[in-house]
């Protein structure tokens, strides 16, 4: 079982590397780690388990956050209609994104960042993702709103980008016009 001790923190070189694609068939280790990443997210959202194991609540995690510079991630997040998006995705790529932008009202956080970083992180409100499941089956997934923000945050990790890289340095509270704000 993964715990917070397994997650590398900002400053670790794996968080700034561009991760390499996995090849199929996946190794047993890659499959196991993907499943453990999803299990971590599920456990972190369970109040009792989170307290028992000292887990910070998370909705997404990428392999580089575990010092594994390979292109896979897990998300476990509900949208505003309580629809669950629960996936382990290998070699995810953003196929298309909306012109309409969105952000979270309270900014973003990260399991690898142990401090609050104020500021808006403006992202696409909708994205279409191409990816593979653990068996190498191609997937085409659409995300909107909060789940779209989460998946973009995790794909950024695969490209060595941290959420705060997107924050306006001169004015962190600057919000461009016509950005939809969630939360």
Curated annotation (Swiss-Prot):
Source species: Listeria monocytogenes serotype 4b (strain CLIP80459)
UniProt EC number: 3.5.1.88
GO biological process, one term: co-translational protein modification
Matching PANTHER family: PEPTIDE DEFORMYLASE (PTHR10458), PEPTIDE DEFORMYLASE 2 (PTHR10458:SF8)
Protein name, per record: Peptide deformylase
One annotated GO molecular function: metal ion binding
Alphabetized CDD domains for the sequence: Pep_deformylase
InterPro entries: Peptide_deformylase, Peptide_deformylase_sf
Similarity comment: Belongs to the polypeptide deformylase family.
Keywords: Hydrolase, Iron, Metal-binding, Protein biosynthesis
Reactions the enzyme catalyzes: N-terminal N-formyl-L-methionyl-[peptide] + H2O = N-terminal L-methionyl-[peptide] + formate
Active site: 154
Cofactor(s) demanded: Fe(2+)
Note describing how the cofactor binds: Binds 1 Fe(2+) ion.
Role: Removes the formyl group from the N-terminal Met of newly synthesized proteins. Requires at least a dipeptide for an efficient rate of reaction. N-terminal L-methionine is a prerequisite for activity but the enzyme has broad specificity at other positions.
Pfam families, sorted: Pep_deformylase (PF01327)
Annotated Fe cation binding sites: 110, 153, 157
């Amino acid at each position: 079982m993964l715990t917070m001790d397994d997650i590398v923190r900002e400053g670790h070189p794996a968080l700034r590397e561009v991760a390499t694609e996995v090849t199929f068939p996946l190794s047993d280790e890659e499959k196991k780690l993907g499943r453990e990443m999803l299990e971590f997210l599920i456990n972190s959202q369970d109040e009792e388990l989170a307290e028992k194991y000292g887990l910070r609540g998370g909705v997404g995690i990428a392999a580089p956050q575990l010092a594994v510079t390979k292109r896979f991630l897990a998300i476990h997040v509900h949208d505003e209609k309580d629809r669950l998006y629960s996936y382990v995705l290998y070699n995810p790529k953003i196929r298309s994104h909306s012109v309409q932008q969105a952000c979270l009202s309270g900014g973003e956080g990260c399991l690898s960042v142990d401090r609050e970083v104020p500021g808006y992180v403006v992202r696409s409100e909708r994205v279409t993702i191409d990816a593979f499941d653990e068996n190498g089956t191609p997937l085409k997934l659409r995300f909107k709103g909060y789940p779209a923000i989460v998946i973009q945050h995790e794909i950024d990790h695969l490209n060595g980008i941290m959420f705060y890289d997107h924050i306006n340095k001169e004015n962190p509270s600057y919000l461009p016009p016509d950005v939809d704000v969630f939360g």
